[in-house]
Amino acid sequence: ARDDEGVPTRKNSLIEQGRLVGYLWSTRDAAQQIAEGRIDIATSTGSAIRSGHQSPPVSGCSNLFLTSSQKGRSYEEMLEIIEDGYIVNSVMGAHTANPTSGDFSVTTSSILRVEGGEVIGAVKQAGLSGNLANALKDGVTLGDEVRPQGSYSSGSMYLPNVLLRNGLRVNPV
């Protein structure tokens, strides 16, 4: 497969053992970063996307997988860990998150209430808000199954179940 500049795509690891180890570059963005003196060396990683045939290519992803080198947890194991909390199956408005501060506020109509490690029922609708850095700082537990959920726009993201222990506020409507 090729990206929207015709460069062959490939697997690009971005984070390994909790450290940033790579970037996604289009040819254009790599050249611009070098020209502006922000970095010394960069080449295309086969990661160019376009929003249309008249728009310039930008760096992006077409198939992003969140995985771990550690063994993931089953759904049942994660329920035991949650004890009291919520299972959020999808959110709306994630694109409105502040990329600088990490603050986000999203809504969901697909949320389950968990008490004592068991699902007790659905919440009709809720708002979720918090700060991504705070939500991630106490560690993240990943599920053992990555499920492709389709593609939106020019990219898609495949996520296992993700357990955030703190840093998230749930505001049932």
Task: For the regions a language model picked out, list residue spans one by one.
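N-terminal small-residue-enriched
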Residues: A1-V173
